[in-house]
């Protein structure tokens, strides 16, 4: 019970961390409003990190990490995926999905995630606009955000990539192996988060960059609960990103 209380307290601490983020609205070509938090570097900087949340949470999971990055002189931007957090509106809301049948929900889900690559690209472009032509950007994807990180890195000069409790399909692992194995890669997974852990091992074995890291945890915690159970994890992620985002 005491351990549970400590974990809950740590979660609340993370989620209530005072943030100096600028709250943004990024508008797509179709006029859809995406909400994001921009953590502006406290100094002139040509480094940035795009933070993509997991599908059972929203961009606030990165409040602490985003602020720490900014304090290190690195621009950071966390995006609420369309249909999540403050980017849920119109046909893309939890209430709308709950009203659908199982079959309808599957179709609606595929329609929703089809928008995400362009939505993430819009966020990347905004972050890139805050830097010179020599700017370098990393991307971290938690859980479902990992596949979006792969797509973004395939199509843009992303320097660093991270998979935070992000299980990948065989197809996505092949995409990583084809185009991204030379990039510094941070991989975080719990041993009993079965499919995710197996995927993480495959990605780590595939990486050819000597700076790639695999952080393994006991248990089955998935994504942001790891930030609560290990209060040093956020700082480690920030330090690793800082060390790898170099020209």
Where are these regions (language model features)?
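Catalytic active-site module of serine/aspartate enzymes centered on a nucleophile-bearing elbow/loop
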Residues: 229-247
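Short alpha-helix in the alpha/beta-hydrolase fold that links the catalytic acid
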Residues: 174-176, 192-206
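Serine-hydrolase catalytic machinery in alpha/beta-hydrolase-like enzymes
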Residues: 26-130
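Primarily recognizes the serine-hydrolase "nucleophile elbow" in alpha/beta-hydrolase
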Residues: 122-181
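Catalytic histidine-centered segment of alpha/beta-hydrolase-like enzymes
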Residues: 220-230
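Short beta-strand/loop motif that positions the catalytic acidic residue
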Residues: 180-181, 187-189
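Acidic beta-to-alpha connecting loop that harbors the catalytic carboxylate
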Residues: 190-194, 219-221
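Sec-dependent signal peptide recognition
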Residues: 2-10
